């Protein structure tokens, strides 16, 4: 039985808003529906949420579920990174679609920096990530997968996630199973874990789903089991 990635990784929306402007953005629709901020194209920082990092029970966190790291002001990033350093019990993930706008170094052991790639024409983002974000851990999310990315340079990448379009737009986009399998094979040849998101079940088949996590994330999940919520 496939698992939902949201059960493994918790959203912590410290920044809400994004300037990228994807036509299929679920975050923008949610913000508009619940009126979280006035203008989604003008990101806002919510430092009060940093207290969530102080909890002792380990957790895997995604910090850019409602934003893009490229839209964070440097001072926001510095404040968040400082808090991450104080809380090594957690693992933290960041995503961007504009790695070309980033330029920083970090030695954080529990921070993972990734790019979203939806088509072959966006493969440059992986190279830009490695060049512009000098970090310990990298990941790539191939979602929603619009076409065959072909041969991908995954050197230095520590995890990949593969998924397709969800929601109202899902009927307009069809991800071929061969694309997902090609990415999986390329990653596995380099020893990179692969997580197929649950929306691939109708395409891949539940019995064929591969849902692997980095060892650091698995350790967090194992420790969680010994804690009472």
Feature names for model-found ranges:
Residues 1-9, 146, 151-229:
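Auxiliary Fe-S-binding modules of radical SAM enzymes
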Residues 1-112, 120-134, 149-154:
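Conserved Radical SAM active-site core
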Residues 61-63, 92-94, 113-115, 138-142, ...:
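Hydrophobic faces of well-ordered beta-strands that scaffold small-molecule active sites
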Residues 67, 98-100, 117-119, 144-146, ...:
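Active-site-proximal loop/turn and secondary-structure-junction residues that shape catalytic pockets
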Residues 72, 142, 176-177:
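Nucleic-acid endo/exonuclease domains
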Residues 79-82, 129-137, 174-186:
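Long, well-ordered alpha-helical scaffolding segments within enzyme catalytic domains
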Residues 86-92, 134-137, 184-194:
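Structural alpha-beta junctions
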Residues 118, 122, 173-176:
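Short capping loops/turns at secondary-structure boundaries
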